[in-house]
């Protein structure tokens, strides 16, 4: 079951449609949690159903009710996160998954060593933060910038998830999902979509805004750049609470940002399912 589908389905179907009733029922319970089925798999179920197989019927009925989704635990109402500022300004995917290390992207463990362009000091600082906050999720942050600009979005998200995400399965090493990422100016659109693929959370912090004069005009500095004003502080080690029901971000019990855009009904489905692919395949299966 921890393979989430694919090649394992063939063997689960062999057991579910086999003659041993006890094993068949156990295999069926596992199949009811799976969504990544090929057409050949659903054809086998359909054929067995048409032949009057009761186990096949129970699996198909379960799929029709989307129990593979409805039986999953709900998203936590409150998620505690601790900020880790990856840098000031835009954070490129090349910082997260350098192009010079593209050859190792298929090896998650090896490629993970290149995070922050092999900056071991920064990697150790991240590990230390995690050790000091074992009960919290790390929120990788772009201060005064946008998170995830650049083209290496999938490998970048995979690498971030490897370091700060949740294990997809206790039996499958180096495959993590659901990272929490944030940026003063939000998340690059394609990077944000890819975060959704993993069931992660992307926050638009807006903790810095352009300063205005009494007439409402943007104040410009001597270099012709807008003067920024800090609305609330986000530094490494700061603890925040995401309330997924209220869709608000809190710091020290005070609301600092509305994060409704990160918790649309669709995105919350992705988070509950462990990624957008599970939702897409599940709806097709249903």
Predicted ranges, named:
Residues 19-20, 52-53:
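Short inter-helical turns and helix N-cap capping residues of alpha-solenoid HEAT/ARM repeat scaffolds
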Residues 54-61, 65-77, 241-286:
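Intein/HINT protein-splicing elements and their conserved insertion hotspots or analogous self-processing inserts
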Residues 4-16, 36-48:
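Amphipathic alpha-helical scaffolding segments comprising HEAT/armadillo-like alpha-solenoid repeats
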Residues 89-93, 147-157, 267-281:
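Conserved phosphate/anionic-ligand binding catalytic regions in large, soluble enzymes, centered on
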Residues 57-137:
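Conserved, function-defining core regions and hallmark residues within catalytic/recognition domains
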Residues 103-250, 255, 262:
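Feature captures the catalytic cores and cofactor-binding loops of soluble hydro-lyases/lyases
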Residues 2, 29-33:
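Core register positions within helices of long alpha-helical scaffolds
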């Amino acid at each position: 079951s921890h393979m989430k589908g694919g090649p394992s389905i063939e063997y689960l179907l062999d057991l579910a449609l086999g003659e041993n009733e006890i094993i068949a029922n156990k295999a069926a319970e596992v199949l009811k949690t799976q969504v990544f089925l090929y057409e050949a798999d659903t054809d086998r179920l359909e054929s067995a159903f048409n032949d009057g197989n009761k186990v096949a019927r129970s699996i198909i009925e379960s799929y029709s009710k989307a129990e593979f989704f409805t039986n999953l635990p709900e998203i936590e109402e409150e998620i505690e996160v601790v900020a880790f500022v990856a840098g000031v300004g835009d954070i490129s995917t090349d910082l997260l998954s350098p192009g010079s290390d593209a050859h190792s992207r298929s090896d998650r463990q090896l490629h993970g060593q290149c995070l922050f362009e092999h900056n071991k000091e920064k990697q150790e600082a991240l590990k230390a933060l995690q050790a000091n906050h074992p009960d919290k999720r790390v929120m990788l942050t772009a201060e005064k910038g946008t998170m995830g600009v650049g083209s290496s979005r999938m490998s970048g998200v995979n690498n971030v998830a490897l370091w700060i995400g949740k294990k997809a399965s206790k039996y499958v090493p180096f495959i993590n999902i659901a990272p929490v990422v944030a940026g003063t100016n939000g998340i690059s659109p394609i990077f944000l979509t890819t975060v959704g693929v993993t069931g992660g959370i992307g926050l638009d912090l807006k903790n810095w805004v352009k300063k205005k004069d009494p007439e409402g005009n943007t104040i410009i500095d001597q270099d012709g750049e807008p003067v920024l004003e800090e609305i609330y502080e986000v530094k490494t080690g700061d603890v925040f609470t995401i309330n997924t029901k209220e869709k608000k971000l809190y710091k020290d019990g005070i609301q600092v940002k509305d994060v409704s855009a990160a918790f649309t009904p669709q995105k919350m489905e992705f988070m509950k399912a462990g990624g957008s692919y599970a939702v897409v395949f599940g709806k097709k299966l249903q």
